[in-house]
């Protein structure tokens, strides 16, 4: 089995019982946009909702990059190194995010580099990988903590030599879905090409997840985001809900949600866990804690798992 095969073919979670904490997981769904150069901090401060300027080397913080209208292009986890800032973002959004930032980067001494090789490992310390191999990315989303390792191309090539030690039955990598499910349970939406530029940060609860700093100063979209914080109120927010009824898949999302009598728009179903039992849905703030709605032409029973 080659390194690439191991990083793209995951064990079936229904037949492989693996611990949810401390399991070594190779994550292809996320990749890295690296920002380097002497103006890196100044450039990112003008583009990100997070306070990149306050980051010490080795620290990580969640954030977002928004359009001038305040719509979220991508959310990210930023990690500062000696030479750069690494933005951990959904893989499918790395090229489009890079293209968006290029028009601003032209005025700064910075370079934007895509890491599209398999470069993200969840819980690498638990897998006993050498810490010199990766950049640690420790971050919190609300009350939940996460750990990942970010590999540059050279480190990825070194990792290929270590992979045989993870191919025995007692030390198999965990399926990627475990890590992604944990992010969903924390309320972190995996944005994609369909949902990018569709939502305001408050709708995605980025203000509650520590991804917006309201004291850092101006950045693209900041005026609209600040107005929502101080003068407005988001009528809908992302909610973690349990589901029962009709089986859905992430491939079919996003889907419109209607009231139980199928008469009024209610919100959108945006992401499911691997077993489709939990979901992230954009729903009214004042939604009852449990009930039913119509989605994909079927009635689904729901129960709120968070109190947003």
Predicted feature residues:
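Structural motif
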Residues: 222-223
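Short, conserved charged micro-motifs
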Residues: 39-44, 94-98, 127-129, 154-163, ...
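Glycine-rich, small/acidic residue-mixed loop/short-helix segments
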Residues: 204, 209-211, 226-308
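Acidic, proline/glycine-enriched N-terminal capping motif
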Residues: 1-73
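Short amphipathic beta-strand starts and helix->beta connectors
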Residues: 13-20, 61-75, 105-106, 127-136, ...
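Acidic, low-complexity central loop/insert segments
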Residues: 21-26, 31-32, 77-186
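Short, surface-exposed secondary-structure edge patches
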Residues: 215-216
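Short, conserved active-site entrance elements at the starts or edges of catalytic domains
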Residues: 176, 182-206
